[in-house]
Amino acid sequence: GLKPPKSLEGRSLKPLLKDPLTEWNGTAITQVLRPADKRLPKPVMGRSIRTERWRYTDWGEGKSGVELYDHAADPMEFNNLALKPDTEAKTVMERLRKLLERKASGKVPTTPFNPKRL
């Protein structure tokens, strides 16, 4: 394969592609720009961090919503723990939010984008 540029963060997923059951520690971070529509007056950036057990997502840096799911108890993500967080959920959300803030911006890009491509 190609050598990644030194400026690119991350690590190869090749071991997981070869063996999906291989040990993997760490987190996965994703971002998605949700365009304005009937429900949203303006675009909002969503960003997520996923550990082996948890997925934390905030929309518009938390101003447009927050989600927390415990994949050990709720692998299909039916119960958003951020809606009524207990002490453990509050602690997890704070820890994951801090990690996420270091890696991904919650701001909507200022450059023009084509919503039809989303």
Per-region residue spans from a language model:
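C-terminal cap/loop subdomain of S1 sulfatases and analogous C-terminal strand-loop tails that border
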Residues: 2-71, 101-103, 107-110, 116-117
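Intrinsically disordered, low-complexity polar regions and short flexible loop motifs
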Residues: 74
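Short amphipathic alpha-helical coupling segments at ligand-binding clamshell hinges
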Residues: 92-96
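Short, polar/flexible loop-turn hinges at active-site or ligand-entry regions and domain interfaces
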Residues: 1-5, 82-86
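Short clusters of small/polar residues that mark proteolytic maturation junctions
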Residues: 60, 80-82
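Cytochrome P450 catalytic domain signature, combining two hallmark sequence patches
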Residues: 24, 87-91
